[in-house]
Amino acid sequence: TRFASTQAWCWQQGARLKWHPFEKDYVLYNDVDKNSYVARLYNLAENRTVSTYCDAFYDVSPDFSYALSLNFSRLQRLRPGYGYSVLPDKTVKDVAPNDDGIFYIDIHNNEKKILVSLADLASDVSDPNVDQHYINHISISPDGKRFMFFHIWTLKGDSHWRTRLCVYSFVDGKVDVLE
């Protein structure tokens, strides 16, 4: 049975639809609301939206206290089929923005902050021919204390990606690169 429709989807990852970790009749999915991507918490039993969050979710913590997000428009531009194409990417001219990267969303307060910036990730990539940096495949650990992600970059005139697996720890606030 259809319960909603959304334009915030892609053929690789859909709308990031997932079950709520505790509420059996609740699902989360990404959507578009005016000029921004959002996440919605939907109650299937009552057929209604319970909450709308300030950004689309890439992954949600096991205790449902926080979510992680990224710039889905940038992801779509740099890796078509993985992001969302409804809204334009405002970072087109920026190789590694300071104010873009992985975002932390406090689910209870519906507040968002940058956690890992593309500029910080790019700072230890020394190749002068770098064209663009981006992030994909964020995955929160089962205990919610860490998450892993791919930091990806391209070089000018080269269609191949450079990728490294990174792990962020909430315990020390550091990113470790696992190459």
Question: What annotation goes with each model-predicted range?
Answer:
Residues 26-27, 67, 147:
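Hydrophobic beta-strand positions that form the internal "hydrophobic ladder"
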